[in-house]
Amino acid sequence: MKTLHVELGERGYPIYIGRGLLGHPDLIQAHLPGGQVLVVTNEVVAPLYLDRMLASLAGKDTGSVVLPDGEAHKTLDSAMAVFDALLARRFGRNAAIVALGGGVIGDLAGFAAACYQRGVPFIQVPTTLLSQVDSSVGGKTAVNHPRGKNMIGAFYQPRCVLADTDTLDTLPDRELSAGLAEVIKYGFIRDPEFLAWLEANVERLLQRDPEALAYAIERSCINKAEIVAEDETETGVRATLNLGHTFGHAIETGMGYGVCLHGEAVAIGMCQAADLSRRLGWIGDDEVARVIRLLERARLPVVPPRELDADAFLEHMAVDKKNVDGGLRLVLLKSLGEATLPVAVDAGLLRATLECYGR
């Protein structure tokens, strides 16, 4: 087992990474303040891991909520189902919520924890590659609005993150590739040595080589923890983690939540961001080709859906948390291994990317 730390003073917490961690109840119980625990999961994860999770909570007053699977259910209605379960069991402020699932469950359960009785502790138990390397770390919690992804949320840190890599054994291939998009992103935005390693080892990751996966998860979490420690609430460097996300969120919203997985949409968005960075003269054709090629090798889509034209993209991109005073701002690439903070860009060049890249 590897143990990393997110350094946020009194609100700092450990990230545990390793195989078989769900079978070590002492790990999770050490971070529970009281005797009441609600496990929030979904209908895909529950048959695989809910009983094991509840066994790790033996001796506690436990309950569970099993929600429908998918981004389309990351809603206020689903959050209300969590609140209903907490209230039905008369759980108080010393109760804890355990998020057992991927990014949707982690975001939703964390949001519910931030809101219930003005905040109760929660623990992240991510079961997908994407959630283990990205969404479970850093305290971003949210639900979606029909007009925009993650528009209703809060910064609220977990008590710990428990990443049992055994759960990746049951992860569908498509979900594994979607998680690799966020792994690869760290190489693009700040870690060129990791990028070179990924270019040499992406096939090992697709084959689920345990050593390669363990290294990629650890290196990704180190990058994420360092960024969060420097900028918890995204007023500076944390915004670079949004490379490809403005384009990607437009795809997710425009196509309907769940049609494209988050990692798939981000992969396309990173290619669009690379194309726009080239048009601005910051990177060259060779760098754009490296971006596209690595994502293709990770079995990710690299061209935008034909159903979304430039005007549709711009309409959805106008609803983005990085925008300032109604003006669009994007995270782009200065080089492979260095991202910009959100910047305003020439409208003509942006439209050229939206109209020409992948069309």
From Swiss-Prot:
Into which EC class is this enzyme placed? lyase
**Catalytic reactions on record:** 7-phospho-2-dehydro-3-deoxy-D-arabino-heptonate = 3-dehydroquinate + phosphate
- Report the GO terms under cellular component: cytoplasm
GO molecular-function annotation terms?
A: 3-dehydroquinate synthase activity; metal ion binding; nucleotide binding
The cofactors named for this UniProt entry are: Co(2+); Zn(2+); NAD(+)
The GO biological-process annotations, alphabetized, read as:
amino acid biosynthetic process; aromatic amino acid family biosynthetic process; chorismate biosynthetic process
Task: List residues binding NAD(+).
Answer: 69-74, 103-107, 127-128, 140, 149, 167-170
Q: Where in the cell is it found?
A: Cytoplasm
What taxonomic classification does the UniProt entry list for its organism? Bacteria, Pseudomonadati, Pseudomonadota, Gammaproteobacteria, Methylococcales
Matching Pfam families, A to Z?
DHQ_synthase, DHQS_C
Q: What is the protein's given name?
A: 3-dehydroquinate synthase
**NCBIfam families the UniProt entry points to:** aroB
Q: Which InterPro entries match?
A: Dehydroquinate_synthase, DHQ_synth_AroB, DHQ_synth_fam, DHQS/DOIS_N, DHQS_C
- Cite the EC number: 4.2.3.4
The Swiss-Prot or TrEMBL record describes its family as follows:
Belongs to the sugar phosphate cyclases superfamily. Dehydroquinate synthase family.
Main localization of the protein described in the UniProt heading: cytoplasm
User: How is the cofactor bound here?
Assistant: Binds 1 divalent metal cation per subunit. Can use either Co(2+) or Zn(2+).
- The UniProt gene name for this protein comes to aroB
* Superkingdom, taxonomy of origin: Bacteria
Binding residues annotated for Zn(2+), in chain numbering: E182, H245, H262
| Keywords tagged on the record | Amino-acid biosynthesis, Aromatic amino acid biosynthesis, Cobalt, Cytoplasm, Lyase, Metal-binding, NAD, Nucleotide-binding, Zinc
- Pathway the protein acts in: Metabolic intermediate biosynthesis; chorismate biosynthesis; chorismate from D-erythrose 4-phosphate and phosphoenolpyruvate: step 2/7
Role = Catalyzes the conversion of 3-deoxy-D-arabino-heptulosonate 7-phosphate (DAHP) to dehydroquinate (DHQ).
